[in-house]
């Protein structure tokens, strides 16, 4: 029995891609406390950017810094889920992969803090 993937095109492909993207975002939100914390932080801070007396470019930078944190967290979550699927045993390389993903999230958080402090200072 062959498992053939159907290649969708045009608007259908876009609709399916959007569906699966939202499905992934929902799965990450429901399974990861860090994703929930970052989404709630964004829900508070993004409206705050419109109350601040900053330029449009600064507002975009503030919002982008928050989105980078969420994007990095989503990628880290994907790496962790894949690692857990491969093996739940303690393994040096799986531990390194998870640590590297965590480091990426940490760097994105530092970047966001630096961006907010620099613009608001």
Which residues does each PLM region occupy?
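Hydrophobic alpha-helical transmembrane segments
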Residues: 1-78, 86, 90-98, 102-121
């Amino acid at each position: 029995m062959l498992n053939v993937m159907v290649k969708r095109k045009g608007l259908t492909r876009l609709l399916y891609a959007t569906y699966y993207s939202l499905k992934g975002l929902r799965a990450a939100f429901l399974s990861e406390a860090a994703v929930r914390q970052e989404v709630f932080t964004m829900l508070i801070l993004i409206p705050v950017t419109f109350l601040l007396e900053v330029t449009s470019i600064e507002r975009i930078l503030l919002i982008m810094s928050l989105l980078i944190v969420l994007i990095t967290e989503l990628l880290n979550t994907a790496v962790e889920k894949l690692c857990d699927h491969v093996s739940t045993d303690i393994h040096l390389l799986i531990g390194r992969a998870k640590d590297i993903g965590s480091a990426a999230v940490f760097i994105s958080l530092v970047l966001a803090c630096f961006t907010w402090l620099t613009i608001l200072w």
